[in-house]
Regions:
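Non-heme di-metal
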Residues: 2-260
Length: 260
C-alpha cells in the first residue's frame, strides 16, 4: 500500500507535470530542458555542495557551539524567509498568462497548475499533515519547528550579535528577486537542493548531543521514502520547481540565470 501523502502522490504530480510539459511544443520543451539541466549541473558542481563541512557533519566532528552558530545564521539567511519566497512565486505565477513559451490556449490555466504544484510545497511548509489532515497544525510548520529548535539550543533569533553579514546578504538577495517568478524558481530550487544535501548531515551531527534535536524540523526534511512515516519531500519539491522553470525559461536570459 502506498503510504505517501497526497503532496508526495505520483498520480497528483504526474497530472500536473503532464500539463506543464505539454503546455509547450515538444521542441521548445526539449531545448529548455537541456538548458535547465546545464543549470542544474553547474549548481550541483558549486563549491557549497562540495564543502568539506559536509563530511565533517556526517562524521559528527562539529561542536555544539559550532552547530549553534550554523543554525542561527541559517535561520536568518533562508529559513525565516523561505515561505515568503514560495508564497510570492505562487502569486507571480500570474505572469504565465503572458508567457510566450506557453500555448495561447493554455496560458490562463497554466498559472493554476503552477500554483497547485507550488502549493503542495507550501502545504508541507505550513504544517499540514497531508496523510491525516486532522493532525495538521501551524505549530508543526517548518518555520515554527525551527524556532523550537533554536529555543532548545538556547538561541534567540532576534539577537543578531553572532549573525554573519553573509546571512543578511543572502536574505537581501532573495528579497531583491521577490518580484521575478523565474528568478524565484531558480532560488527555490537551489534552496531545496541545499536542504537535501545539508539536512541529513546536520541531523547526524546534532544527534550526538541530543536525540531531541533530530525531531521536529529535521524529521520533516530530506527525500520522500516509500513506507516512511515522515513527511519529508524535498526531492519532489525540487524536481517540481525545475519543471516550472523549464516551462518559463527564456534563452535570452541564459546569462542572467547563470549569474544568478
Amino acid at each position: 500500500m502506498n503510504t505517501f501523502s497526497f503532496t508526495q502522490s505520483e498520480q497528483t504530480r504526474t497530472e500536473l507535470l503532464h500539463f506543464i510539459q505539454n503546455s509547450l511544443n515538444a521542441e521548445l520543451w526539449k531545448t529548455n530542458t537541456q538548458a535547465v539541466n546545464a543549470l542544474k549541473q553547474s549548481i550541483a558542481d558549486h563549491a557549497l555542495f562540495q564543502h568539506p563541512m559536509l563530511q565533517k557533519l556526517h562524521q559528527c566532528q562539529l561542536s555544539l557551539e559550532q552547530l549553534k552558530f550554523i543554525h542561527l545564521n541559517y535561520f536568518t539567511a533562508i529559513v525565516k524567509n523561505f515561505t515568503d519566497a514560495l508564497s510570492m512565486a505562487i502569486y507571480q505565477a500570474c505572469g504565465l498568462e503572458k508567457c510566450p513559451n506557453i500555448d495561447a490556449g493554455k496560458r490562463i490555466a497554466a498559472k493554476i497548475y503552477a500554483r497547485y504544484l507550488l502549493s503542495l510545497n507550501l502545504m508541507d511548509e505550513l504544517g499540514f499533515n497531508t496523510r491525516q489532515l486532522e493532525k495538521s497544525s501551524a505549530a508543526k510548520s517548518h518555520l515554527v519547528y525551527f524556532l523550537t529548535l533554536l529555543q532548545q539550543l538556547n538561541l534567540d533569533p532576534a539577537n543578531h550579535q553572532h549573525t554573519e553579514p553573509e546571512a543578511f546578504a543572502l536574505a537581501q538577495f532573495i528579497q531583491k528577486h521577490i518580484n521575478s517568478y523565474a528568478d524565484l524558481l531558480l532560488i527555490l530550487a537551489c534552496t531545496e537542493l541545499q536542504v537535501i544535501k545539508f539536512s541529513e548531515a546536520l541531523r547526524n551531527n546534532m544527534s550526538v548531543y541530543d536525540r531531541l534535536f533530530t525531531e521536529g524540523y529535521y524529521a520533516c526534511h530530506g527525500i520522500a521514502e516509500q513506507g516512511s512515516a515522515e513527511l519529508a519531500n524535498d526531492d519532489n519539491h525540487e524536481d517540481d520547481i525545475w519543471a516550472l522553470l523549464t516551462q518559463c525559461y527564456s534563452q535570452e536570459n541564459e546569462l542572467h540565470f547563470t549569474q544568478l
